[in-house]
Every structure is written in structure tokens, then in C-alpha cells.
Amino acid sequence: MVADKSKKSKIEEKGEEENLEQIDAELVLSIEKLQEIQDDLEKINEKASDEVLEVEQKYNVIRKPVYDKRNEVIQSIPGFWMTAFLSHPALGDLLTEEDQKIFKYLNSLEVEDAKDVKSGYSITFHFTSNPFFEDAKLTKTFTFLEEGTTKITATPIKWKEGKGLPNGVNHDDKKGNKRALPEESFFTWFTDAQHKEDAGDEIHDEVADIIKEDLWSNPLTYFNNDADEEDFDGDDDGDEEGEEDDDDEEEEDGEE
């Protein structure tokens, strides 16, 4: 009897091992099939990306003359880009008082994708003759490399004699005395371009993204921002007055 039980136990163990081997084989087969499906999806995604790029390239060509026409009209509006820049909720805080003096000479802004779109883009600020620097335009270029990194280059600013990066601005304190508070100039966005390892690079890249994807696409939204805010504030005041009236009525009812 003992021998029979031992023999039976070995048979059961062998059967379990065969079942495990079968399960393992089925699992491997399922994973292989899943990988094949994922490979098919990857091919479709790559094809879709290529076609999206082709469409983007096509419409970049179509947009170009429209952007040129828009630029012509913008140049007839004094201080357009400075106003749009200052009215932007994120970009407006980046300009020091000294930067704003320079921005008065900004007469056009241009964002241009690389011809194949995927290689990168450039942002160019065009200035009229000014007392700060010699350059008629300042360009910052973002080149997307194959290894996944981004190469950033920018126009070295040729400051005029006695001029340079605005490092601070005078503020009046409570005693009426002026004191210098350090503020980073927006123009460090150009001068820091070569220092990719610098901790500020993420902020600078974010600035480029905002200019490219938001400000450039519809600057009129921000140029008109002050008027919109006034309208909005007016509505808020009306709502607050209405709420106060309601509160007064409730208090009177309570007293009765």
C-alpha cells in the first residue's frame, strides 16, 4: 500500500510539472503574439506621425503669406507686441522696467518651424534702431537632435557702449529712498542659450513654448486683454453688489 501511494504521488507530481510546462508555453506564446500586435501598432503610429508631419508641412506653407499679411497690419499698430507681451499672464512678469524700455523698439515677432517641422524651430524678435544694441534682430533656435536632445543657439547681443543686460531696477521704498533690487532681465533668455546644463534652462524652454504655442498663434487675444479684464471686473462688481443687496434683504427679513 505504501509503495502504491508513493507511486501515485510521483505520477501526480509529474502531471503537475507537465501542466506547468504547458502553462509556461502558452504564456510565452501569448506574449509573443502580444509583441507582434504591438509591433503592428508601432508601424501604424510611425506612419501616422509621418503623415501628420506632411500635413503640417503643407499648412505651414499655406500659413506663411497669411502670417506675413498679419505682420504688415501689426506694424501699423504702435507698441502691439510689447502690449501683447505685457498682457500675457505668464510672459508679462518676465520683463523688468528696463526690459520694457527696450521692448518699445520691438516692431515684429516671428516663429518659424524647420522645413521638415520635426527638426526644430526658431523665434526671432525684430527691433527698430535703438539706443541699446546694434542688432536689428535677435533669434533663438531650437534644434531637435536624433538622440533626443535639443541644441539651443541664440544671437549674441551686441550691446552699445555703456549698455548691457539690465540687472536691476530702482524701486522706491517707504522712506522715499531708491534701492536696487536684482531682477533677471528677459534678455538673459538669449545669453544663457549656450548653458544647457544650467538649472534655468527648463524655464527658458517653457518661455519658448509659450511664445510659440500661445502668443504667436493669436497675439490679438493678449493685445485686447486689458479691455476684456475691465469688462470682466465690471461684471464681478455687479455680481458683488447683487450679493450684498440679497444679504441686506435677508438680514431685514430676519429682524422682522
Swiss-Prot record:
The free-text tissue note of the record is: Ubiquitous.
Q: Where in the cell is it found?
A: Cytoplasm; Nucleus
Tell me which domain of life the UniProt entry assigns to the organism this sequence originates from. Answer: Eukaryota
Consequence of gene disruption: No visible phenotype.
**Keyword Endoplasmic reticulum on entry:** no
GO terms for CC?
cytoplasm; nucleus
Record's keyword terms, sorted: Chaperone, Coiled coil, Cytoplasm, Nucleus
Q: Which InterPro entries match?
A: NAP-like_sf, NAP_family
Q: What is its main location?
A: cytoplasm
Which portions of the sequence form the region Disordered? 220-256
Stretches with biased composition (Acidic residues): 226-256
What Gene3D superfamilies does the entry give?
A: 1.20.5.1500, Nucleosome assembly protein
Q: Which residues form a coiled coil?
A: 23-64
* One MF term in the entry's GO annotations: chromatin binding
One BP term from GO: double-strand break repair via homologous recombination
Subunit annotation: Can form homomeric and heteromeric protein complexes with NRP2. Binds histones H2A and H2B and associates with chromatin in vivo.
Please state what the annotation says regarding this protein's domains. The acidic domain is probably involved in the interaction with histones.
Functionally, this protein is described as follows:
Acts as a histone H2A/H2B chaperone in nucleosome assembly, playing a critical role for the correct expression of genes involved in root proliferation and patterning. Required with NRP2 for the maintenance of cell proliferation and differentiation in postembryonic root growth. Involved in both intramolecular and intermolecular somatic homologous recombination.
Sequence similarity: Belongs to the nucleosome assembly protein (NAP) family.
Remarks, anything else? Double mutant nrp1-nrp2 shows arrest of cell cycle progression at G2/M and disordered cellular organization occurred in root tips resulting in a short-root phenotype. Double mutant nrp1-nrp2 also displays hypersensitive response to DNA damage and impaired somatic homologous recombination.
Annotated protein name in UniProt:
NAP1-related protein 1
**Native species of this protein?**
Arabidopsis thaliana
